[in-house]
């Protein structure tokens, strides 16, 4: 399962957790402007906006999990198993396979408004990448500094929903997730008053009691509520370090620890990586399950007019700083 979120301070930030029981060998992948993106149902995007994000590169093609383009439009795909239904190929339509959905939108659209227009005419198909890599059942969070939408391809068509909560998890479908927030309208970061009865001398015995009832389990419905509550009440400084640090704390509220979510006997879902990007500056930050230090790759330090993918392996070895090591300044 996964969780994605947006966050606005002086800059605009977005990112996600990838929660799964195994890795496909994810990398930080930059698709420069002149890398040819061959579309499965015809046509090649010879030139496009530069993109940075996490992807599995298969047969030279970047299968993006999440990414942001040089203009500040970002997108993340999250599991939507059992609910996602894609269209069949339709002649005389722009047919886009789900695995090329992220590079198609981010490669051609500079803003959320432009992406909304593109979605009016796209036909999203379930064409598999290969026999080894069938179509993933996904829905997507798409956002820039102007707002966020959720895209779901379901039995009755492609749906685009405004997302005022600024978060997305997995099932159930997004309208149900938003409706369920009504059950938690009493939650608050403030300490509660005794509204139970004037006849009872009820007292506060702990801090944080305003959020009693906030779900704490790992289900996607509970993570949606917890991520929304945490994001909407987060407070941080406006600077880069404060903003990035707070974003990782927001997603830290829903990260999964190895051993707590068994998917098969002896196999456990865990947060393989957490990402955060500064959409304005094109900086992609991440941590991994086995390296909690924040690493970063900056889009604009590369040759964005190149024609080959630029790839950085994720850092997965724990990096511990010894403050009292000889010659070390704390």
Where are these regions (language model features)?
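Catalytic cofactor-binding cores of redox enzymes
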Residues: 121-159
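A contiguous strand-loop segment
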Residues: 1-94, 126, 313, 323-328
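Proteins synthesized as precursors that undergo proteolytic processing into mature forms
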Residues: 92-128, 240-248
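C-terminus-biased signal that marks the final domain/tail of proteins
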Residues: 1-13, 127-130, 135-136, 145-147, ...
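Broad, structure-driven detector of short, well-ordered beta-strand segments within folded domains
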Residues: 28, 68, 149-153, 159, ...
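Short, flexible loop/turn elements at secondary-structure junctions
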Residues: 18, 79, 144-146, 155, ...
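Short, surface-exposed beta-strand-loop junctions and turns on beta-sheet-rich folds
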Residues: 20-22, 81-83, 156-159, 166, ...
């Amino acid at each position: 399962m996964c969780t994605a979120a947006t966050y606005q301070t002086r800059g605009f930030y977005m990112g996600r957790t990838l929660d799964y029981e195994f890795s496909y060998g994810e990398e930080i992948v930059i698709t420069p402007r002149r890398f040819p993106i061959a579309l499965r149902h015809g046509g090649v995007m010879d030139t496009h906006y530069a993109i940075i994000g996490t992807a599995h590169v298969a047969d030279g093609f970047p299968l993006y999990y999440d990414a942001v383009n040089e203009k500040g439009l970002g997108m993340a795909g999250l599991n939507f198993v059992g609910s996602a239904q894609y269209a069949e190929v339709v002649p005389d339509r722009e047919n886009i396979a789900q695995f090329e959905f992220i590079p198609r939108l981010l490669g051609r659209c500079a803003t959320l408004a432009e992406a909304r227009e593109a979605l009016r005419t796209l036909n999203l198909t379930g064409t598999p990448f290969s026999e080894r890599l069938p179509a993933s059942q996904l829905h997507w969070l798409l956002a820039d500094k102007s707002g966020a939408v959720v895209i779901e391809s379901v039995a009755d068509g492609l749906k685009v929903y405004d997302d005022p909560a600024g978060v997305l998890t997995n099932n159930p479908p997004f309208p149900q997730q938003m409706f369920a927030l009504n059950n938690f309208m009493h939650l608050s970061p403030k300490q509660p008053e005794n509204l139970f009865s004037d006849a009872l001398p009820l007292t506060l015995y702990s801090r944080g009691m305003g959020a009693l009832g906030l779900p704490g389990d790992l289900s996607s419905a509970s993570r949606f509520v917890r991520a929304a509550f945490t994001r909407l009440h987060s407070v941080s400084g406006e600077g880069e370090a404060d903003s990035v640090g707070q974003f990782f704390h927001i997603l830290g509220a829903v990260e999964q620890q190895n051993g707590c979510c068994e998917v098969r006997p002896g196999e456990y879902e865990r947060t393989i990586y957490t990402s955060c990007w500064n959409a304005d500056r094109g900086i992609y930050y991440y941590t991994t399950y086995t390296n909690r230090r924040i690493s970063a790759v900056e889009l604009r330090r590369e040759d964005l007019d190149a024609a080959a993918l630029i790839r950085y392996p994720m850092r997965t070895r724990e990096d511990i700083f010894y403050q009292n090591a000889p010659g070390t300044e704390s």
